[in-house]
Amino acid sequence: MSKARVIAFYLPQFHPFKENDAWWGKGFTEWTNVGKAKPLFRGHYQPRVPADLGYYDLRLPIIREQQAEMARNAGIEGFMYWHYWFGNGKTLMANIFNEVLESGSPDFPFCLGWANHSWSRRTWNSSSQNHKDVDLMIQEYPGDADIISHFNNVLPAFKDKRYIRVDDKPIFMIYDPMGLPNPRHFIDIWNRLAKENGIDKGIHFVGLASGWLEKYSRILEIGFDAIAPSNLWVAESKVKGRLIKMVGHKLRKIGRASCR
């Protein structure tokens, strides 16, 4: 039996960029809120100060090199960089991955995952003073021309020698596979374009999904090659279903007895 291939999700956000400056204030990064965390009870360790690399800045190549080395030592095969394409050529935080691609460094395997979802103000502000949500970047699906433009945007990555493949097909994960207006049409266009550009076997499409088996089936039926479960505890509960049913039965009996 072959070993599972461990690939770590890589969020390219931990650095200042102009959109975050405009939305949250000059110099804002995800570290801003990490550093502001306060203990809520005795013994609560907050804020959690990051070890090893500290409050790192992903704009620094040395940080990316050190991350790759740490991942390699931990048995991780590669990184799946989150990729943001909002339609009509609108992207966010592409600079980090573009530097990795163009520089050839770190020399560590990678693939891409499309985070096809809108950004809203509630991401970092869910306080009672701000109940009304505000869209900051809206995920759009303009049509075939945009599907083609999107493919051309990631084609250089697919052709990189570091790109992770399954059966000689580059992996491409989609965060919300059911959010695509016509997933099979998208997959068909990309596979056609891949073959026209020398990727003879096409793309290995992976759909991110919660742990419900019904959703898994739907994603595979619309043309995806594989599933990446996001709630492994649900899958585990299904494996242990017999035990969970037995515990549930006992709890119901206790509940009925206490009501008598």
Where are these regions (language model features)?
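Glycan-processing catalytic domains of CAZymes
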Residues: 1-260
